[in-house]
């Protein structure tokens, strides 16, 4: 019997590791990402879990932008931070109006964009950017998503967006 080898599979550019918590999504995603990078592929590993452990696995600080993993050539990783994504989204909406509208109107806009719905929208936008950004698509052979337990349906939403 021949040993299992990822390099012999015809994998899509996007790989999703989903499921309930505690089943080994992060461990498996990291193992697959490392194996693909070791075989010469350029790989981006993205965690959409606010309680991500990627920084612990690779023993380095990670942010929302891809960071090369020094011990694994060809592998970069990112932690999608929903709070940071919400702040960036909020500012992108409000910035054009600063200095144009009164301060009270800006404060009202900030308040309106401070809820949990804004966080969800912003997190989804940040997630979708990893799929739709052409520079990211061209930079990596594979983009692997290590999802939060409650984000298991995000892949369904992404597939629906791509079908349009």
Regions found by a protein language model. Give the residues of each.
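Flexible phosphate-sensing "switch/lid" loops adjacent to ATP/NTP-binding sites
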Residues: 1-10, 15-16, 23, 28-164
């Amino acid at each position: 019997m021949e040993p299992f080898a990822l390099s012999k599979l015809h994998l899509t550019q996007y790989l999703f590791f989903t499921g309930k918590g505690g089943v080994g999504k992060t461990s498996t995603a990291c193992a697959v990402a490392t194996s693909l990078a070791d075989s010469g592929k350029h790989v981006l590993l993205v965690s959409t879990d606010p309680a991500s452990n990627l920084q612990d696995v690779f023993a380095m600080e990670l942010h929302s932008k891809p960071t090369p993993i020094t011990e694994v050539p060809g592998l970069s990783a990112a932690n999608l931070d929903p709070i940071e994504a919400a702040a960036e989204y909020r500012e992108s909406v409000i910035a054009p109006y600063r200095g144009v509208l009164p301060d009270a109107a800006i404060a009202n806009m900030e308040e309106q964009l401070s809820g949990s719905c804004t966080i969800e929208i912003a997190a989804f936008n940040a997630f979708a950017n990893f799929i739709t950004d052409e520079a990211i698509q061209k930079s990596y052979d594979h983009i692997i998503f290590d999802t939060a337990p409650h984000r298991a349906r995000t892949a369904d939403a992404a597939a629906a967006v791509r079908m349009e």
